[in-house]
UniProtKB/Swiss-Prot annotation:
GO cellular component: cytoplasm; Holliday junction resolvase complex
Gene3D superfamilies: 1.10.8.60, P-loop containing nucleotide triphosphate hydrolases (3.40.50.300), Winged helix-like DNA-binding domain superfamily/Winged helix DNA-binding domain (1.10.10.10)
GO terms (BP aspect): DNA recombination; DNA repair
Protein name: Holliday junction branch migration complex subunit RuvB
Region: Head domain (RuvB-H), residue numbers: 256-334
Gene that encodes it: ruvB
Catalyzed reaction equations: ATP + H2O = ADP + phosphate + H(+)
Length: 334
């Protein structure tokens, strides 16, 4: 798969950059107003009762700030944040070691929690409900179960695929918060804030131009800003102007709607070779040289979101809106 500027996933280098940009409090966090308002109430109530915050499940598309919110929750509760991920916990003993090392009130953040194995999930159930850990000592006839008390803690789970969580695990979270794609004005505010942290000037129109092409995702907005900053600095500018932003984004092949060269390749292949569809997923895969699951999981979601692609029982279909975006005549379908 080609490297994409508009990918919503982060690599290791980018994760380190994101950490340096993260807001530390709910008041600094831009966007997701309903989620922020509710979390603010739950956090304040827990502090007033001098209790741990109820377990929190954050879900939604990647790149929207779930990890940042977990860090903010810990900061607002004035406790330590412990971070791990579903794939990193390979055995029940790995999770037991993490749980027994927690201090009272700590926030344990598990990213990609939907990827936990079932046997590991079962260790979490008593830990989440009763703050205890059931372990088996010995084998065979001599085996016996021992219950260890755990300090009260808050589990924050994050997932991009909430439907893959088992019902018993999902139901043990007292707070469920879905993160939505960002409004353009909030993304422009994020771009301006990041530019200030990068110590480079940017005007409102330039911030809005970057925001417009960011697919509603802060991670994409910050990545595009970094690349536009490169163009500005090489040109000898200490500030990003609208002309520089537009020129840089066009050279980076990110169009006005945030579509990149791979999106264009997929849509134009369907239009030019199959009259816009319907086309089967395997056929599209063979035509553009990408794996079917990559098309389905990586490329299609945004095209579906903006209404450029439809899934039908007979296959994928390019919509009128996509034809109009490419300034092409819409075919008359049978």
């Amino acid at each position: 798969m080609d490297e994409r500027l508009v990918s919503t996933e982060a690599d290791n280098h980018e994760s380190a950059i994101e950490q340096s940009l993260r807001p530390q409090t709910l008041s600094q966090y831009i966007g997701q107003q309903k989620v922020k308002d509710n979390l603010s109430v739950f956090i304040e109530a827990a502090r007033m009762r001098q209790e741990t915050l109820d377990h929190v499940l954050l879900y939604g598309p990647p790149g929207l700030g779930k990890t940042t919110l977990a860090s903010i929750i810990a900061n607002e509760m004035n406790v330590q944040l412990r971070t791990t991920s579903g794939p990193a916990i390979e055995r029940p003993g790995d999770l037991a070691a993490i749980l027994t090392s927690l201090e009272p009130g700590d926030v344990l953040f598990i990213d990609e929690i939907h990827r936990l194995q079932r046997s590991i999930e079962e260790v979490l159930y008593p830990a989440m409900e009763d703050f205890c850990l059931d372990i088996v000592i010995g084998k065979g006839d001599t085996a016996r179960s021992v219950r260890l008390d755990l300090p009260p803690f808050t589990l924050v789970g994050a997932t991009t695929r909430v439907g893959l969580l088992t019902a018993p695990l999902r139901d043990r979270f007292g707070v469920h918060a879905r993160l939505e794609y960002y409004e353009q004005r909030d993304l422009a505010h994020i771009v301006s804030r990041t530019a200030e942290l990068f110590e480079i000037g940017i005007d409102l129109r330039s911030a809005e131009e970057i925001a417009r092409r960011s697919r509603g995702t802060p991670r994409v907005a910050n990545r595009l800003l970094r690349r536009v900053r490169d163009f500005a600095q090489v040109l000898g500018n200490h500030s990003i102007t609208e002309d520089i932003a537009e020129d840089a984004l066009e050279r980076l092949q990110v169009d006005k709607l945030g579509l990149d060269h791979i999106d264009h390749k997929l849509l134009l292949s369907m239009i030019e070779k199959f009259r816009g569809g319907p086309v089967g997923l395997d056929t599209i895969s063979a035509t553009i040289g990408e794996e079917s699951h990559t098309i389905e999981d990586v490329y299609e979601p945004y095209l579906l979101q903006i209404g450029f692609l439809q899934r039908t029982p007979r296959g994928r279909v390019v919509t009128r809106e996509a034809y109009e975006h490419f300034q092409m005549e819409v075919p008359i379908r049978d």
